Amino acid sequence: MASILPASNRSMRPDKNTYERKRSVYVKNPYLEGMDEDILYHLDLGTKTHNLPAMFGDVKFVCVGGSPNRMKAFAQFMHKELRLEGDGEDIEDICAGTDRYCMFKTGPVLSVSHGMGIPSISIMLHELIKLLHHAHCCDVTIIRIGTSGGIGIAPGSVVITDTAVDSFFKPRFEQVILDNVVTRSTELDKELANDLFNCSREIPNVPTLIGHTMCTYDFYEGQGRLDGALCSFSREKKLDYLKRAYRAGVRNIEMESTVFAAMCGLCGLRAAVVCVTLLDRLESDQINLSHDVLVEYQQRPQLLISNFIKKQLGLCDQMS
């Protein structure tokens, strides 16, 4: 069956020479051009109700993460790091009219929550990418900041993803469109990953590595946990699976990276995934960290991304 969008699985990532000019945000949907109005329903924004270029035209960095509270805290942190006016404590949620996602803007940095799992982040990404396109943004870098389960590495380690893989350790995202399965690449920007890793060397006591990230559709059975409401496999099979994942280059597991990599690549966005690990899945299934340790671990990717953004903006002298 022929697709009405035959090129929808072909990346719009520009070549290296294009990076020296302007990188636009592409949308691969011919029907958008003919729409009188585009309502970004889940963000409570729209092309007629809001002046998107005025609101978002200066955005250069988009940071997304699952938790609304964590993304608000990151926005407040960036407000201080960029030394913007005010204390940032009363920062406005741009998406306050909806309870699906939250969004905060601090200078050229946009912080957005995406919920948990592929369906939730994909909805947000569709509308976020359209927002950036309607706002005529260019040279945008998008980074997912998250938590994850590690494989064979110490809790608290930060993993910068070089390749997002599925549950079969393959670098692909399979999207069901109508009654077709469309396979899309999960390639991420390797130069960006290396830049982030180099930034991590300047942050003490934050072990950081580059590795594959496995994306699953489920937190329990899909990640081989023995502590869910359902479990149909043995401890031995679980460990065999996770060890095979490790041998395939996987260093952490989460639930969003494949669709994130696929959609960002298709739309010409320079993208990275940076997640801290909360446990070693070869040792345990449950997260039993104290609150203080959990908070400190969650701040580690934020410190790295803040360092990277300030370097890109030429604000290295403002390192705190």
Curated annotation (Swiss-Prot):
One annotated Gene Ontology cellular component of this protein: cytosol
Complex formation: Homodimer.
Pfam families: PNP_UDP_1
Name of the coding gene: Upp2
Keywords: Disulfide bond, Glycosyltransferase, Redox-active center, Transferase
Organism field: Mus musculus (Mouse)
InterPro entries per the UniProt record, alphabetical: Nucleoside_phosphorylase_CS, Nucleoside_phosphorylase_d, Nucleoside_phosphorylase_sf, Uridine_phosphorylase_euk
GO biological process, one term: UMP catabolic process
GO MF: deoxyuridine phosphorylase activity; identical protein binding; uridine phosphorylase activity
Function recorded in the entry: Catalyzes the reversible phosphorylytic cleavage of uridine to uracil and ribose-1-phosphate which can then be utilized as carbon and energy sources or in the rescue of pyrimidine bases for nucleotide synthesis. Shows broad substrate specificity and can also accept deoxyuridine and other analogous compounds.
NCBIfam families: euk_UDPppase
Keyword Aminoacyl-tRNA synthetase annotated: no
Pathway it works in: Pyrimidine metabolism; UMP biosynthesis via salvage pathway; uracil from uridine (phosphorylase route): step 1/1
Induction conditions: Directly up-regulated in liver by HNF-4-alpha (HNF4A) binding to the promoter. May also be indirectly regulated by signaling via various orphan nuclear receptors. Strongly up-regulated by a liver X receptor (LXR) agonist. Slightly up-regulated by a pregnane X receptor (PXR) agonist. Strongly repressed by a peroxisome proliferator-activated receptor alpha (PPAR-alpha) agonist. Slightly repressed by a farnesoid X receptor (FXR) agonist. Shows a diurnal expression pattern with peak levels 12 hours after light onset and lowest levels 0 hours after light onset.
Enzymatic reactions: uridine + phosphate = alpha-D-ribose 1-phosphate + uracil; 2'-deoxyuridine + phosphate = 2-deoxy-alpha-D-ribose 1-phosphate + uracil
Regulation: A conditional disulfide bridge can form within the protein that dislocates a critical phosphate-coordinating arginine Arg-100 away from the active site, disabling the enzyme.
Binding site for phosphate: 66, 100, 144-147
Protein known as: Uridine phosphorylase 2
